[in-house]
Curated annotation (Swiss-Prot):
Stretches in topological domain Cytoplasmic: 1-108
GO molecular function (one): serine-type peptidase activity
Lineage of source species: Eukaryota, Fungi, Dikarya, Ascomycota, Pezizomycotina
Gene encoding the protein: DAPB
Function: Type IV dipeptidyl-peptidase which removes N-terminal dipeptides sequentially from polypeptides having unsubstituted N-termini provided that the penultimate residue is proline.
Key words, A-Z: Aminopeptidase, Glycoprotein, Hydrolase, Membrane, Protease, Serine protease, Signal-anchor, Transmembrane, Transmembrane helix, Vacuole
Composition skew (Low complexity), residue ranges: 22-33
InterPro entries xrefs: AB_hydrolase_fold, Peptidase_S9_cat, Peptidase_S9B_N, Serine_Prot_S9B/DPPIV
Protein name per the record: Probable dipeptidyl-aminopeptidase B
Originating organism: Colletotrichum graminicola (strain M1.001 / M2 / FGSC 10212) (Maize anthracnose fungus)
Ranges annotated as spanning the membrane: 109-129
Length: 921
């Protein structure tokens, strides 16, 4: 069978581990010894004729200190570059050696012994090779759990940036059949097939038991284009109706924000293979969102922020549902902050299963302040400047609610398709308009379950609305701030469980992720208004994705959790009555899995993401009556590359800080030697609930630094991050940046005490929240542990960031003024205590505004602080890509770090002019 759906090369965030398939063979050991003999001889030769000053732990004790006038022997430097770990990127300390004369007789004895040794070694090598025991390192499978590496090439920065090391992955567009058939997928653009085809995932399998139940494939679109009015248009996206008689096709898509876009929409008829405009009277009207009715008889869509309905009953008339949509009123779609922080999608429209009602969000941005984004080279507004004004920058103004400012006012409205009217349902005891966040909307037959919180996200109301009776009530109120001082995270995995008395489900219910004990677990609420659930999971571990799927026939709930280890992920199932919790994946091996289930949960795309080379399979689940397995991706090319290149040695462990066990991964250079003194780069993100230490396979920038530059790279997930217990997560509330920085400093102090670490050369870096915590760490440490730092797109004051994210962790500036003062990067005198640091930012960043960097620069100017470098990128957003900027970011990080660890930045402070260059001898 062809690989289902679309293959893509996806970056995966971390380095892996592999099972210990094979230890070092005799030959690889011999190779290592041979390499070290050569290395020893070469170094001994140069050290006998060259004096080098060993650095002390003090600031002035760098090997490349500007006062080291005797470090000018070019022959030494040239030879030294052959060792990646002591070459141009790493200036090692050497001990002083004296030349000792040797008499001729002793020389003769030494030569005879050397000749005998070489003869014996050659004979042993001949026997060794003749026994065919030799295996070159490039033929040995990559083992991420290995404690040493063989020979190979270093990882390059070009490879990391180009995607050379990205595992190939596939996604499946699972689709439910018109009659509820399970295991169907949507194939688009598959080689040798029609353009859009519905396939049974088991098609092509020769097993008679499997093939007997395969649903016949069905072509929806033959060609990779549609003809409209004599024009051939290429689809940007395709969405079949549930009955598979029509396809909603979008063309000419234009991006707006992270998830949102506008496009032209067309209705494609499968039988006639013809297309017509979604709105025949406005065929070129750009649509923001279009959604099928579950009954396949209508499409609801948003255009110009108003909601419309197109019925497919032969009448091509379009009904306008709302009329006052515009720049400040949105219907059926989220505004910027709800798209970014709440729904993580471009949709705020929800159809009832019977197609009789449409729930949609109304967003009023009238009171939300605007933030101007300036573009100096591009014109994202699409507006041409009038003659004579072409040199002025383009400007895009977005309604961006910052912490403490006015939030958009949101309401949930309903459209009765049969009556044609819009209505709302008032609920007693609700949050005030400026204090209400609507986080989730879920249809449950003719009822709607709504989760809303106050704006600081520590009180939740669960509301149940009866759309037929047009009434509603609050069924549960939870004050988690009172419970543990924490907050509610937004979840989109809540699933409706319809009643089935014959199958042990007497009433409707739902499954949700809830706070239970010291973490996130899944619970079953039934009936719908029950506030006391059955907890399906519990214990000293957490559910990461749940419910991932529900098999209603067998009452099985699938989920992904950290039950084996906080840095692993396995898939499990549990019965709705809480019995029979068992793993679906093999838990005997360290693994990190992701999974995508078919509509009926009978099949799944199982993605193994590490620590070995990633692979993917389509498999049957315990819910399927027939066993099935098909390998989709082996990543054989990646496996071959991993054999040929020297990937870092991965050392996983835990570090105890203030009694809390923190996960870490230490990436060591391929030929790590505990007798050497290594610089250390700490890389972290540190954001609330995030995780950077895990068992995924990844070869990334950190891998390049360890492999090619020869530095140690350490990642420690400090308090505030995810999956180390809720108590350790919510500790950071009201003072972001304090415990995160504290734990990075504690980790750096632990590494500085190690014998193989040069304590004078320790740096830290991060992007976004990681950039913020880099600066907070440098500020708190004031140069006592960290010498250098690199911050990309950092927040420097949380009063500048969006309200929904910030207030969840900090509450409002009005409620927590001292917290905001303390969390801002403001102690610039402490920053002056570091040797040097780097800051980079995109001028067109719509997420973390460039104002963050400019404000910090002004504080530095006011205090005369100059020990930093800045690089800004015009027109780049938070990802920094405009005009090849992303490559420049990583080039800058790499080169800046090399200069830092080579001691070059020590020469910048107090620089003195050289009137006449020093003559070379």
């Amino acid at each position: 069978m062809d690989a289902p759906a679309t293959a893509s090369r996806q970056p995966i965030a971390e380095e892996p581990r592999m099972s210990q398939e094979s230890s070092l063979s005799t030959v690889s050991t011999t190779s290592l010894v041979f390499d070290r003999l050569h290395e020893h001889n070469e170094k001994s030769y140069h050290s006998s004729s060259q004096r080098r000053r060993a650095p002390s732990a003090s600031r002035g004790g760098y090997a490349d200190h500007p006062d080291d006038d005797d470090d000018d022997d070019e022959s030494y430097k040239e030879a030294d570059t052959n060792d990646l770990e002591t070459g141009p990127f790493l200036a090692p300390a050497s001990v002083m050696m004296r030349r000792v004369g040797v008499d001729r007789g002793l020389k003769k004895v030494i030569l005879i012994l050397a000749a005998a040794f070489l003869f014996a070694w050659g004979a042993a090598l001949f026997v060794f090779l003749s026994n065919k025991s030799y295996k070159h390192a490039s033929t040995i499978d990559h083992d991420p759990s290995a404690t040493s590496r063989g020979s190979g090439k270093p990882v390059t920065l070009d490879q990391v940036i180009s995607g050379f090391w990205y595992p190939t992955s596939h996604s499946i567009s699972w689709i439910e059949g018109p009659n509820g058939e399970d295991g169907l997928l949507l194939e688009q653009g598959a080689r040798g097939k029609d353009y859009l085809v519905v396939e049974d995932v088991r098609s092509g399998n020769k097993d008679s038991q499997v093939s007997a139940n395969v649903v016949q494939s069905r072509t929806l679109m033959k060609n990779p284009w549609i003809n409209v009015g004599g024009r051939q248009l290429a689809p940007s996206d395709t969405r079949p109706s549930k009955d598979m008689k029509k396809v909603l096709v979008s063309t000419d898509r234009q991006r707006n924000w992270r998830y949102s876009y506008t496009a032209l929409y067309w209705i494609f008829d499968v039988e006639t293979q013809t297309a017509e405009a979604l709105d025949p009277e406005h065929p070129d009207g750009r649509v923001q969102l279009a959604t099928w009715s579950p009954q396949s008889n209508a499409i609801v869509f948003t255009r110009d922020n108003n909601l419309f309905l197109r019925k497919l009953d032969g009448d091509k008339k379009v009904t306008q549902i709302t009329n006052d949509g515009g720049p400040e009123y949105f219907y059926g779609i989220p505004d910027w902050v709800y798209e970014e922080e709440v729904f993580a999608t471009n949709s705020a429209t929800w159809y009832s299963e019977d197609g009789k009602y449409v729930a949609f969000l109304r967003t009023n941005e009238t009171g939300v302040p605007e933030y101007p984004l300036q573009y100096f080279l591009s014109r994202p507004s699409g507006k041409e400047k009038p003659p004579g004004e072409e040199t002025y920058p383009d400007e895009k103004r977005i309604k961006y609610p910052r912490a403490g400012s006015h939030n958009p006012v949101v309401d949930l409205l309903f459209f009765d398709v049969e009556r044609g009217d819009v209505f709302s349902v008032d609920i007693d005891g609700g949050f005030a308009d400026d204090d209400r966040l609507i986080n989730m909307v879920l249809w449950a037959n003719d009822k709607v379950l709504i989760k809303e919180t106050n704006r600081v996200s520590d009180i939740m109301r669960v509301v149940l609305v009866d759309v037929v009776a047009r009434t509603g009530k609050t069924v549960n109120t939870i004050d988690v701030g009172e419970l543990d001082g924490g907050w509610f995270e937004i979840s989109h995995t809540t699933q409706f469980i319809p009643a089935d008395p014959a199958n042990g489900r007497p009433q409707d219910g739902y499954i949700d992720t809830v706070v239970h004990g010291n973490g996130d677990h899944i619970a079953y609420f039934s009936p719908m208004d029950n506030a006391e659930p059955v907890y399906l999971t519990g214990g000293d571990w957490e559910v990461d994705d749940g419910p991932s799927a529900v098999d209603l026939k067998n009452n099985l709930v699938y989920f992904v959790a950290t039950k084996e280890s906080s840095i692993q992920r396995h898939v499990y199932s549990v019965h709705l009555n809480r019995s029979d919790l068992k793993p679906f994946t093999d838990t005997k091996f360290e693994s990190y899995y992701d999974i995508s289930f078919s509509s009926g949960a009978g099949y799944a795309l199982l993605s193994y993401q590490g620590p070995k080379i990633p692979w993917q399979k389509v498999v049957s689940t315990p819910s399927s009556p027939v066993s099935y397995e098909h390998v989709v991706e082996k990543n054989e090319d990646l496996a071959e590359n991993a054999k040929k290149y020297e990937l870092p040695i991965l050392n996983y462990g835990t570090l105890k800080v203030d009694g809390v066990e923190l996960n870490y991964v230490e990436r060591r250079p391929p030929h790590f030697d505990e007798k050497k003194k290594y610089p250390v780069l700490f890389q972290q993100y540190s954001g609330p609930g995030s995780q950077s230490v895990h068992k995924k396979f990844a070869v990334d920038f950190q891998s390049y630094v360890a492999s090619a530059l020869g530095y140690l790279v350490v990642t420690v997930d400090g308090r505030g991050t995810g999956f180390i217990g809720r108590k350790n997560r919510v500790l950071i509330r009201d003072h972001l940046g304090y415990w995160e920085a504290h734990d990075q400093i504690a980790a750096a102090q632990a590494w500085a005490a190690k014998k193989y670490v040069d304590p004078a050369r320790i740096a830290i870096w991060g992007w976004s929240y990681g950039g913020f915590n880099t600066l907070k760490t440098l500020e708190m440490d004031a140069g006592r542990t960290f010498s250098y730092g690199m911050a990309v797109a950092p927040v420097t004051d949380w009063r500048f960031y969006d309200s929904i994210y910030t207030e969840r962790y900090m509450r409002t500036p009005q409620l927590n003024p001292s917290g905001y003062d303390q969390t801002a990067v403001s102690n610039v005198s402490a920053l002056a205590g570091n040797v040097r640091w780097l800051m980079m930012h995109g001028v067109g960043d719509d997420n973390v505004h460039y104002q963050n960097t400019l404000t910090l620069l002004d504080k530095l100017d006011l205090n005369g602080i100059e020990n930093y470098d800045v690089h800004v990128f015009p027109d780049s957003d938070h990802g920094i890509y405009f005009h090849g900027a992303n490559r420049i970011v990583y080039d800058k990080l790499s080169n800046w770090l090399i200069n830092a660890f080579n001691g070059e930045w020590l020469k910048v402070a107090g620089a003195k002019p050289i009137v006449e260059p020093k003559a070379r001898v």
